[in-house]
Amino acid sequence: MQVFEGKLNGKGLKIGIIVSRFNEFITQKLLAGALDCLTRHEVENTNIDVIWVPGAFEIPLVAKRAVHKDYDAIICLGAVIRGATPHFDYVAAEVAKGIAAVGLEANKPVIFGVLTTDTIEQAIERAGTKAGNKGWEAALAAIEMANLFKKV
């Protein structure tokens, strides 16, 4: 029996990070968590590109272009927070579907690190307080998946 798993060492990996500027007070913390994780796992700073987009809805479109670059993985970071209108439901669903579709179509790890929360407080908790930092977790998944793709 063979077992395949990705190692958590980022040495030599090239990572693209797409970050939504909307709700930047949250996404800035997600980005900081992702960068910290990548650095601690030996991804060289020169092998990390950060791409800012206006909002979460634009992430899949830019990810679709970025997968054709030499990245081993792409991390998508954003924060969609529920408001008083159904806008949240449309944006959250389309961003999730879009990011998944890009990864499947490109056969490359495209990691979903977009918060979809009911409140600002929940977003803050997931950006580095009570519930950890989902940017860090997305970066760790990117490292693991990039290494796994080299084996499978």
Swiss-Prot record:
5-amino-6-(D-ribitylamino)uracil binds at F22, A56, F57, E58, A79, V80, I81, F112. The active site is at H87. Keywords: Riboflavin biosynthesis, Transferase. It comes from Carboxydothermus hydrogenoformans (strain ATCC BAA-161 / DSM 6008 / Z-2901). Its EC number is 2.5.1.78. GO terms for cellular component: cytosol; riboflavin synthase complex. GO terms for molecular function: 6,7-dimethyl-8-ribityllumazine synthase activity. InterPro entries: LS, LS/RS, LS/RS_sf. One of its GO terms (biological process) is riboflavin biosynthetic process. It is an enzyme of class 2 (transferase). The keyword Transferase applies. This is 6,7-dimethyl-8-ribityllumazine synthase. Catalyzes the formation of 6,7-dimethyl-8-ribityllumazine by condensation of 5-amino-6-(D-ribitylamino)uracil with 3,4-dihydroxy-2-butanone 4-phosphate. This is the penultimate step in the biosynthesis of riboflavin. Pfam families: DMRL_synthase (PF00885). Pathway: Cofactor biosynthesis; riboflavin biosynthesis; riboflavin from 2-hydroxy-3-oxobutyl phosphate and 5-amino-6-(D-ribitylamino)uracil: step 1/2.
